[in-house]
Amino acid sequence: MGSDVRWKLCWENELQLADHVELSDFFLKTYGRHGAFLAKPFEGGRTWAGARPEFRAIGYDAHGIAAHIGILRRFIKVGEVDLLVAEIGLYGVRPDLEGLGISFSLSVVYPLLQRMGVPFVFGTVRQAMRNHVERFCRGGLASIVSGVEVRSTLANIHPDLPPTRVEDVIVFVAPIGRSMDEWPSGTLIDRNGPEL
């Protein structure tokens, strides 16, 4: 896949309306096959589900968008430690390209992550994606952090729901400016905002 995909690395404010329309369609198809609820945030040309990324890596091939990864710098709290991270989210691969590995996405943005000055990349996926993340971590680029729940705010206010939720998700961390040994211990990560 890597040799057939060309990457567009861009800041959020560099995207044009046509980019958002194409990305929205990509997310509707990519997330929608796992349930209409997951696709709903992307209706109407929207290209983010919770927090809006500040940077995107968009992979294109002869058939259009092949893959996408969003990045957002933010402070999270791991246990009692405030920590700057680059959160990775809005990850998607076109269904016909799945199973070819996700490590290519991180390797494409690794130089940018170094320039951002973040000590770690942080990401979460639902439990159903465990096999994909384990494959990615086997390459040594990241580690799964077990025994941790993540608290996030909801992206929108709902009068019948609390403003935050705590989830048992797969947490993965990739060291960028520090070693993995320096990741703080704790059983709760406060995202202090909506997920990416």
UniProtKB/Swiss-Prot annotation:
GO cellular component: cytosol
GO molecular function: acyltransferase activity
Domain of life where this protein originates: Bacteria
Primary location recorded for the protein, binned into one broad class: cytoplasm
EC identifiers of the protein: 2.3.1.-
Catalytic class of the enzyme: transferase
Compartments where found: Cytoplasm
PROSITE patterns: NODA
HAMAP family for the chain: NodA (MF_00084)
Functional description taken from the UniProt entry: N-acyltransferase required for nodulation. Acts in the production of a small, heat-stable compound (Nod) that stimulates mitosis in various plant protoplasts.
Family note: Belongs to the NodA family.
Identification of the protein by name: Nodulation protein A
